[in-house]
Amino acid sequence: MEPAFWQQRWADNQIGFHQAQVNPYLQTYWPQLQLAPGSRVLVPLCGKSLDLAWLAGQGHRVLGVELSRRAVEDFFREHGLEAEVRQQGAFEVWRSGDVQLWCGDFFALRAEDVADCVGLYDRAAVIALPVQMRARYMQLLSGLLPANCRGLVVTLEYDQSLLAGPPFSVRDEELRQGFAGWQVEQLEAVDVIEDSPKFVQAGASSLLERVYQVSR
């Protein structure tokens, strides 16, 4: 999947993956991670998610990584924030207060960029990537993030033969294999097929949304 795909989705405003409210799983389960105030949290493929502002509101320093400059611009504009912009390596870094959005290719991140990220939040990153890219993505996370990191990961599981994706289906065993070396605990699994007409029309009988806590 090429970067141009996501750039075009944002250009055409085809952003059905964007949620108009803070994710309820985040609000429910994030507190149990017990991250200290001021902890830095990595949010891969963040878009203009409202979850970024929520995390900052909990006292965290937020590092979102997003390919689309349009998404980054929209986040700061929609929150009424003035951002300082600078170049750092392969990324254009936008900053306002405790929120930094790094505009560029996630796979260009270096270990020193995220060495102090002790939190991870992935609601729509791993499910946005086809199988080979998401294996590379999870391997990169494990290689970059420090040993004391913990966070939340949200996945979807359905019959992939019915829909091409994204979002892509990620099976439980694939997620656990991708986070080998981490402690992986499933916190919740909910069938959301009744709220997902696209999947119903495609013939899917279930759409399982899973929430995991990952830590090491």
UniProtKB/Swiss-Prot annotation:
Q: What is this protein called?
A: Thiopurine S-methyltransferase
Where does the chain bind S-adenosyl-L-methionine?
W10, L45, E66, R123
Q: Which reaction does it catalyse?
A: S-adenosyl-L-methionine + a thiopurine = S-adenosyl-L-homocysteine + a thiopurine S-methylether
- Example of a GO MF term: thiopurine S-methyltransferase activity
InterPro entries named among the record's database cross-references? SAM-dependent_MTases_sf, Thiopur_S-MeTfrase_Se/Te_detox, Thiopurine_S-MeTrfase, TPMT
Superkingdom of the organism of origin:
Bacteria
Which cellular compartments is it found in? Cytoplasm
Q: Name one GO cellular component term.
A: cytoplasm
Q: Which UniProt keywords apply?
A: Cytoplasm, Methyltransferase, S-adenosyl-L-methionine, Transferase
Q: PROSITE patterns recorded for this chain?
A: SAM_MT_TPMT (PS51585)
Its chief place of residence is: cytoplasm
* UniProt-listed SUPFAM superfamilies: S-adenosyl-L-methionine-dependent methyltransferases (SSF53335)
